[in-house]
Regions:
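Rossmann-fold cofactor-recognition segment
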Residues: 63-79
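Conserved glycine-rich cofactor-binding loop
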Residues: 25-27
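Conserved NAD(P)H cofactor-binding loop of Rossmann-fold oxidoreductase domains
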Residues: 104-109
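A short, exposed helix-loop element centered on a Lys and neighboring polar residues
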Residues: 136-137
């Protein structure tokens, strides 16, 4: 039997925290959104499928969660200008961003490298890497307002 990890969140730890979740329309992104909503987070949900976002928004509101902001956003088709427009909207509507959960991604093509085209590789890199880079980079001023750094001295050599 496959082990399924569980997530334990202390009561009120996400209450009124602003959390942006990509890939929120289905799968892991949707599950993370529902858990965060049950814990009263203020959600910004991104997906390329607006119908799935509307459905999730209804579920969250019906279950007593805060009404999430939903944004149709296709990481495969988005340009830098689209990312900038999204970031500008975040700056206009939020004082800070407490969390950024990158879930949107594509598996890619399961074939030997000899059978993989450059365009197939570019698709995977654009959705799985470039989108995370651009969204994080443009959101950093909002995220830095909520960062906490903890370090523990460690020894590099025994």
């Amino acid at each position: 039997m496959k082990h399924v990890p569980s997530i334990s969140i202390s009561k009120d730890s996400l209450s009124n925290k602003n959390i942006l979740i990509t890939g929120a329309g289905s799968g892991i992104g949707r599950a993370v959104a529902k858990i965060a909503a049950k814990n009263k987070a203020n959600l910004i949900l991104l997906s390329k499928d607006i119908k799935k976002l509307y459905s999730l928004q209804d579920e969250i509101c019906d279950e007593g969660g805060n009404d999430p902001l939903i944004v149709e956003f296709d990481f495969l088709k988005a340009s830098e200008k689209d990312y900038k427009k999204l970031a500008d909207s975040l700056y206009e509507n939020y004082e800070k961003l407490d969390g950024l959960v990158h879930v949107a991604g594509v598996l890619g093509y399961l074939s030997p490298i000899i059978n993989t085209s450059l365009n197939q590789l570019k698709t995977v890199m654009q959705v799985n890497f470039e989108s995370n880079f651009l969204l994080t980079q443009l959101s950093l001023p909002l995220l830095l307002l909520s960062l906490i750094h903890i370090s523990e001295p460690t020894r590099l050599n025994p």
